[in-house]
Regions:
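Anion-recognition interface
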Residues: 1-335
Length: 335
């Protein structure tokens, strides 16, 4: 058996990959082999090359197959391939990559409740870029984000064995993503048999953290600040403002119009339970609660945060930032 994990964005894929990489002995004891590319964390190289393959270019596909074909000849083993990049791959090309390999193939993929999925992906986009667009603009550019039925049907044309799981913690086995994933591979596995796990999380920004990053990106556009250590800066952002609730900006991006727009775009997600009953995505009333209240205190907090980031060497403040500049930017997102 080959388990092909399509790591849909914001569904704990990195945590799964680190666990698989760091527990080779455990996998070996259960006749499992985790296949990765040369970097050793996941199988990103395959989807990356497939992205540039024109139709069924056998030469390119064979070049990828050579990287793992000798490994999967072991008939008494099961194999795991994982990559976020499979989400954007052409299923037909992936089929040609694995066909006639001598193993049955089972697709594994996790799916999120639509509202949280849009929010989490928006936050990550703002965190990792210098973009300044509002949530409403992001929504309008992501029409396919929650078309779960199309995604599923495109893959089962070539891979009829498909396991879909609800990413919600209450739906996970023992409320544990790693255990939930491993139970798919090893149905008889008991929770206490699982090796100790490292906490690896691709954390999202808090709501004020998102607002701060939008303000920061505007300052970048105005050449008032510059980034000196991008990797460290982006990784540090989720750690900021964790001690503040900032209820004045709770879900500030989720206006009634935005909420209704996401709901209307996510019809397939809400009907996905017809295929997989456990994927019955329910909305919370709290999702509708949002605040867009500007306080002068936000400016002081932002200036303190900018100075702290400069002291750490992550950024440089190039020009004197006026309170009026910050106030104008804040109000752009809080109106």
């Amino acid at each position: 058996m080959i388990y092909l994990h399509i790591g849909r964005h914001k569904t704990g894929t990195t945590s799964i990959q680190y666990f698989l990489r760091d527990n080779q002995d455990f996998l070996d004891n259960h006749n499992l082999i985790y296949v990765t590319d040369e970097k050793g964390l996941a199988f990103h190289e395959g989807p990356r090359i497939l992205k540039n393959v024109v139709e069924n270019d056998n030469k390119e596909i064979e070049s990828i197959r050579k990287s793992f074909e000798k490994i999967v000849t072991k008939k008494n083993k099961d194999f795991i391939f994982s990559s976020e990049s499979f989400q954007n791959s052409n299923p037909e090309l992936v089929y040609h990559l694995f066909k006639d390999i001598g193993h049955e193939i089972n697709i594994i993929s996790y799916f999120r409740e639509p509202i949280s999925y849009f929010i989490s992906s928006y936050k990550q986009r703002i965190q990792n870029t210098d973009l300044i667009f509002k949530f409403s603009d992001y929504i309008n550019k992501q029409e396919n984000l929650t078309k779960y039925i199309d995604f599923y049907e495109n893959w089962i044309k070539y891979f009829p064995s498909f396991t879909a799981r609800n990413f919600s913690r209450k739906n996970l086995k023992n409320s544990d993503l790693i255990y939930d994933f491993m139970k798919i591979l090893l149905p008889k596995l008991e929770y206490q048999e699982l090796p100790e796990k490292s906490e690896i999380a691709n954390r999202s920004l808090s709501d004020f953290g998102l607002l701060f990053k939008l303000v920061f990106n505007n300052l970048l556009k105005l050449n008032m600040v510059s980034i000196k250590k991008p990797g460290q800066f982006y990784n540090y952002l989720p750690e900021m403002f964790t001690d503040h609730s900032f209820l004045d900006v709770k879900n500030f991006y989720l206006t009634k119009d935005n909420y209704e727009r996401v709901i209307s775009m996510s019809e397939q997600a809400f009907n996905f339970e017809k295929f997989f009953p456990e994927c019955n995505f329910k909305l919370k009333i709290s999702d509708l609660e949002s605040n867009r209240n500007f306080r002068g205190e936000f400016i002081e907090i932002t200036l303190d945060a900018l100075n702290s980031l400069e002291r750490k060497g992550f950024i440089e403040i190039n020009k004197n930032i006026l309170n009026s500049d910050l106030s104008k930017i804040f109000r752009e997102y809080l109106q």
